Every structure is written in structure tokens, then in C-alpha cells.
């Protein structure tokens, strides 16, 4: 049996994507819509306080295309806290005019390829990646993925050393985009339908296409990668929520 890679796990993660029922939303009076928006912004302010205390992080983006209208990416120390956030949001007036489009549950994950004599949880750089402050980049790209396990293309039957070698080569491509694209990898084996979630942040949306396309030619992706639905969007700052929901 091949050796399983050890992982380092950080904050739990929820990608919550929703569509807005604009037709029903328009039936509310201006006052009712304003009250609903204020209620929603109060929840966002709670999230901001948690982030300021470094007990979690969040990102909010509008999604381009028909798959969804808005995405919340939420990071918290426990799965219970993610559930509480989701439930509180579902109880708002605004949620009555939102339709669940997609969700993904995972945990921030790093593969442990550090020297055996080093405690990764004492490494500030590792801690910053396990418990990240999500960036306020202009754009987001999220997609789930698996490692293929079919016939001769079975990732999980490869020896550990070969997997390390392949992942090192794969990572070299990603490092070429340092400063252009920030990546958050979350593990979801046993949590959701795929094995990993990949979230990319960039100020230049074209960098997503360049990075993903270049990685398609790397053996890890070309031979072993299987991908789910891609979601791409634009940042939605709190101060623009009112204009976004204005009808």
C-alpha cells in the first residue's frame, strides 16, 4: 500500500454561493429592502470584528454568469461556527430572496513536506497559510478537484517519493505567479464531493486563465487532475452592498 501524505490543517472553510431572486426582491417596498440590507450589513460587521480579532476571515464576491450571483468564503476555527454563520444568514430577510446555488465544505490544508525535525506549527510562514487573512483582491476563482484513480493513472498508487517529485514540479509553475495570484488550498476528503477546493485571488482576472492553462500541461494536472465547476467573480466590498442590491 502506498504511503498517505501527512497534512497540516488550519481553519475550516465554507464556500456559500447563492442566486438572488430579483423578481421577488423587487416586490418589497423601498423601506423593506432598506431594512433587509441593514440587517445583512450588521452580520457583515460581526464578521469584520471576528477578522479583526484574528479568529477567522471572510471574502464576499459577486459571481459572473448564471451559476450564482454572490459567493461568501468563510474561515473559522470550528465547523460549528461555520454552521452558526450559515444559520444566522438563513434567518435574515435577505435570505428569503436568495436561492442556494452551490456550497463547499473543507479545511485549509498544507501537505507536510518539511524536514522531520521541524515543527510546522512553530513556523510563522506556515501558520500564516493555515490561518490566512483572505485578501481583498479584485477577483476570485474557485473550483473543486480530485486526483484521478483509474487504471495506470491512479495517483494514490504512486510511491510517496514520486508524488513528492511531481508536486514539486507542479508547485514551481504556481510560484512563477507569486505576486500575481494568491492561492488557498482546502482539503475536503470526507467533507464534500471532491477532494480539494482551490481558491485563487488576483487583481488581474486574466492571470487565472494563464495559470490554470499553463498547469494543464504539467503531468499532475494533465494525467491525474479532474476538475469540477469553476466560479469566477468580482469583489463586493461592504460599502457597495447597498448599490448591488438596489433595484
UniProtKB/Swiss-Prot annotation:
Q: Which GO terms describe its molecular function?
A: heme binding; metal ion binding; oxidoreductase activity, acting on the CH-CH group of donors, oxygen as acceptor; peroxidase activity
Q: Kindly give the InterPro entries that the UniProt entry links to this protein.
A: CHDC, ChdC/CLD, Dimeric_a/b-barrel
Recite the UniProt keywords alphabetically.
Heme, Heme biosynthesis, Iron, Metal-binding, Oxidoreductase
Gene3D superfamilies recorded: Apc35880, domain 1
Q: What class of enzyme is it?
A: oxidoreductase
Named cofactor requirement(s)? Fe-coproporphyrin III
EC number(s) per UniProt?
1.3.98.5
User: Which Pfam families does the record cross-reference, listed alphabetically?
Assistant: Chlor_dismutase (PF06778)
Pathway in which this enzyme or protein is active: Porphyrin-containing compound metabolism; protoheme biosynthesis
The residues annotated as the active site are 143
Could you say which residues bind Fe-coproporphyrin III here? 129, 143-147, 170, 183, 221
Catalyzed reactions per annotation? Fe-coproporphyrin III + 2 H2O2 + 2 H(+) = heme b + 2 CO2 + 4 H2O; Fe-coproporphyrin III + H2O2 + H(+) = harderoheme III + CO2 + 2 H2O; harderoheme III + H2O2 + H(+) = heme b + CO2 + 2 H2O
- How are cofactors bound according to the entry's free-text note? Fe-coproporphyrin III acts both as a substrate and a redox cofactor.
What is one Gene Ontology biological process annotated in the Swiss-Prot or TrEMBL record? Answer: heme B biosynthetic process
Annotated membrane-spanning segments are none
Q: Which PANTHER family match?
A: COPROHEME DECARBOXYLASE, HEME-DEPENDENT PEROXIDASE YWFI-RELATED
**HAMAP family assigned:** Coproheme_decarbox_1 (MF_01442)
Describe its function: Involved in coproporphyrin-dependent heme b biosynthesis. Catalyzes the decarboxylation of Fe-coproporphyrin III (coproheme) to heme b (protoheme IX), the last step of the pathway. The reaction occurs in a stepwise manner with a three-propionate intermediate.
Similarity section: Belongs to the ChdC family. Type 1 subfamily.
Q: What is this protein called?
A: Coproheme decarboxylase
Give the originating organism: Bacillus cytotoxicus (strain DSM 22905 / CIP 110041 / 391-98 / NVH 391-98)
Organism placement in taxonomy: Bacteria, Bacillati, Bacillota, Bacilli, Bacillales
Gene behind this protein: chdC
Amino acid at each position: 500500500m502506498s504511503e498517505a501524505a501527512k497534512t497540516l490543517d488550519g481553519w475550516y472553510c465554507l464556500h456559500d454561493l447563492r442566486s438572488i431572486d430579483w423578481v421577488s426582491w423587487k416586490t418589497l417596498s423601498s423601506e423593506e429592502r432598506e431594512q433587509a440590507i441593514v440587517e445583512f450589513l450588521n452580520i457583515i460587521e460581526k464578521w469584520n470584528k471576528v477578522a479583526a480579532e484574528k479568529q477567522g476571515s471572510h471574502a464576499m464576491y459577486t459571481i459572473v454568469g448564471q451559476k450564482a450571483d454572490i459567493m461568501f468564503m468563510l474561515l473559522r476555527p470550528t465547523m460549528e461556527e461555520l454552521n452558526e454563520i450559515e444559520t444566522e444568514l438563513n434567518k435574515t430577510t435577505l435570505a428569503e430572496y436568495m436561492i442556494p446555488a452551490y456550497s463547499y465544505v473543507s479545511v485549509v490544508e498544507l501537505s507536510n513536506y518539511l524536514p522531520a525535525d521541524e515543527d510546522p506549527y512553530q513556523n510563522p510562514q506556515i501558520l500564516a497559510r493555515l490561518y490566512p487573512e483572505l485578501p481583498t483582491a479584485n477577483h476570485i476563482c474557485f473550483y473543486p478537484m480530485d486526483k484521478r484513480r483509474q487504471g495506470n493513472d491512479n495517483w494514490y498508487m504512486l510511491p510517496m517519493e514520486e508524488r513528492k517529485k511531481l508536486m514539486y514540479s507542479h508547485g514551481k509553475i504556481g510560484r512563477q505567479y507569486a505576486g500575481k495570484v494568491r492561492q488557498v488550498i482546502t482539503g475536503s476528503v470526507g467533507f464534500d464531493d471532491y477532494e480539494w477546493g482551490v481558491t485563487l485571488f488576483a487583481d488581474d482576472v486574466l492571470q487565472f486563465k494563464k495559470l490554470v492553462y499553463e498547469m494543464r500541461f504539467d503531468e499532475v494536472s494533465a494525467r491525474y487532475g479532474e476538475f469540477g465547476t469553476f466560479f469566477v467573480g468580482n469583489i463586493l466590498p461592504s460599502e457597495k452592498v447597498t448599490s448591488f442590491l438596489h433595484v
